[in-house]
Amino acid sequence: MIIGLGNDLVDIRRIEDSLERFGERFIAKVFTEAERATAERRSGRARSGAYAKRFAAKEALVKALGKDGVSWRDIEVANDGDGRPFLSLSGGAAALLARRIPAGMIARLHLSLSDDYPLAQAVVIVEAQPA
């Protein structure tokens, strides 16, 4: 059963501006250390695109679940061994997800990311499946 669907489109130039204007303060507020490490392995547009896709994924998840008690760093975007992106939740985000999933069900999160400068997009589906 679908619990929520979220989509977000980010102008990568807006993220570039935030990185330039606020630097470390912006990165520390929004991204986990692992997300930062992933983005910082890149340079130029690839770096800002990596940050923008992760920002879009966080926004898309909030649209799918809600924001109640969730901080940016409670939502982490990572990649599996094949490079597929996935979401890892902690803190307020994990608690909110647990409240949204009916008893006897388990949560499954689906994430798709895309970018084509100057845009980055994320789609998140929150699904509940029988345990």
Swiss-Prot record:
State the needed cofactors, names only: Mg(2+)
Tell me the superkingdom of the source: Bacteria
Q: What is its main location?
A: cytoplasm
Sorted alphabetically, the keyword list is:
Cytoplasm, Fatty acid biosynthesis, Fatty acid metabolism, Lipid biosynthesis, Lipid metabolism, Magnesium, Metal-binding, Transferase
EC number(s) given by UniProt: 2.7.8.7
Matching Gene3D superfamilies? 4'-phosphopantetheinyl transferase domain
For the protein in the UniProt heading, the enzyme class is transferase
One Pfam family from the UniProt entry?
Answer: ACPS
The answer to keyword Disulfide bond applying to this record is no
Task: Please state where this protein is localized.
Answer: Cytoplasm
- Cellular component terms (Gene Ontology): cytoplasm
Q: Cite a single GO MF annotation.
A: magnesium ion binding
Q: Where does Mg(2+) bind?
A: D8, E59
Identify the HAMAP family for this entry.
AcpS
Q: What does this protein do?
A: Transfers the 4'-phosphopantetheine moiety from coenzyme A to a Ser of acyl-carrier-protein.
Please report which protein family the annotation says this sequence is part of.
Answer: Belongs to the P-Pant transferase superfamily. AcpS family.
This chain's protein is named Holo-[acyl-carrier-protein] synthase
Q: Which organism is it from?
A: Paramagnetospirillum magneticum (strain ATCC 700264 / AMB-1) (Magnetospirillum magneticum)
Gene symbol of the encoding locus: acpS
